[in-house]
Amino acid sequence: MGQYVAPIRDMQFVLHEFLNVTEEFKNLPAYQEIDADIINQVLEEGAKFTQEVLFPLNHSGDREGCHFDAATKTVTTPKGFKEAYKQYVDGGWAALGCDPEYGGQGLPVSLNNSFYEMLNSANQAWTMYPGLSHGAYECLKEHGSDEQKAQYLPKLVSGEWTGTMCLTEAHCGTDLGLLRSKAEPQGDGTYKISGSKIFISAGEHDVAENIIHLVLARLPDAPEGSKGISLFLVPKFLPNADGSLGERNPIFCGAIEEKMGIHGNATCQMNLDGAVGTLIGQPHKGLNAMFVFMNAARLGVGMQSLGLTEVAYQNALVYAKDRIQMRSLSGPKAPDKPADPIIVHPDVRRMLLTAKAYAEGARAVCSYVALQIDRELNHPDEDVRKEAAGEVALLTPIVKAFITDNGWIATSEAMQVYGGHGYISEWGMEQYVRDARINMIYEGTNTIQSLDLLGRKILMDNGAKLRAFGEKIKAFVEENGLDESMSEFVTPLGELGEKVGKMTMEIGMKAFTNQDEVGAAAVPYLRVVGHLVFSYFFAQMAKIALEKKDSDDKFYESKLATARFYFARLYPETAMLIRQARSGSANLMALDADLF
């Protein structure tokens, strides 16, 4: 069903030419031995696995879905998923970006990130089984006790066990302060946890022998609200001292959800009836610990939409070159055929270029953020680590919300290229649209990401993170402002930077008297800032392409054309968005609720 070819050439461009990661790695002691050959080899081997093993299971997994056995409370994944997971584990892919102390290969986040894109292009639903495990690994690595780390991290790193996060309950999604699950202390340092969780991705399955659930619950003396939530490690099977599986813990799947998309992943209702767990971190500080998992998941969701955008674009492009319909408006382009390929039609090209631009822009941004994580975690200079952490915090909601919004747009446009055939399941395009839709919802809705960006990441620190990033943009604009060949990119970039600064100040002043101004402006505001980031990166990539314009490699010609399309056709929506963000809250809040 369709095709997927990992975009290795563009990944290499981003890593080697745009980010020059091997030079960056020289300043990171853990990665000084990572060279271009290692990077390229990982990309090539990752492409083989995702193209040959995972992609063939994508459409069949969507058709078959997961099967729940109410009698045994077990879930069977689609045909081939379990075998593919074994190949993934046997190939060492689970350990790629993990700490060697726990059996990992210790490769950079920025390299693992590219492989993760391939996984999501090939099969998003399957990728969620190991993908969530990495978030559990990060959370335990930072907040787990020495005993928890020793007992669980090697198994998570190897892929023998998988992980989940259990946050949501029927009455509380975004507002976790309403959470009701309870944890009763036992005399031996463990806790018995009771409650019900919903929407738990990969909560029950057959691909691994054990599942490590990270569960939010309240202790008996917990304060009300979000300040009274603790985090617990609750394994499906309680491990014995030697690491073998012991007693079955009473945390069971009660049902799996019927969903719009990601049918190959089990979205579970999980019931805990006195399940044994151990505390992660400090009592009542569970959200602090869980945010390590959640932030990793938010970046991962952006990668999911990047992956879907890429594979949808690839298939739409093949179709547009093969499908013949009508003649070109400017005269026949294939006179030997009864009609021209539809790629000659301007609006078909608009749809294709929209997906292409959103894929290439997202790849650059996600790779940049991954490199900043490498710097944050490994650079010997504390100031550099702090700067990198600030950029990761600023850009995480952009990756989660802007890229997933774009993924919905891009997969829809790619399906539209097919006309009526795109709406038919056998072509596979409608699956990408269905799968992409959840990415705007889970791991914090895109509205919540917008509030996080404007309210917490920008206004709460008086715009310090945004200004620091803006200084980089300003320096680039000043450096290239006199280069006529760059004016079509640098001029709009500089103008948007100034507009974002003024808009931020205006919204901040309004918020002093009415906090609804933040909520009213947040969604269009995030999209404007997303375009600012994309504009900055497209301008930099265009500069590289211009420097290689005399090359025989047509890749650079394509890269330059994509940047020009972005600034001509996608960037202009910022004018509308700025007007929306500045329009105030009255047009939303004045109408009485009874009059809706």
Positions of predicted regions on the chain:
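Acidic, low-complexity proline/glycine-rich segments
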Residues: 1-26, 278-283, 321-322, 327-334, ...
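Amphipathic, small/basic residue-rich leader segments at the start of a protein or domain
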Residues: 1-127, 147, 151, 374, ...
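A short core secondary-structure module
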Residues: 190, 194-248
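Alpha-helix capping/hinge segments and adjacent helical runs
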Residues: 2-5, 185, 262, 368, ...
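Glycine-rich cofactor-pocket loops
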Residues: 31-33, 63-77, 289-300, 314-355, ...
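C-terminal amphipathic alpha-helical interaction region
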Residues: 102, 460, 475-596
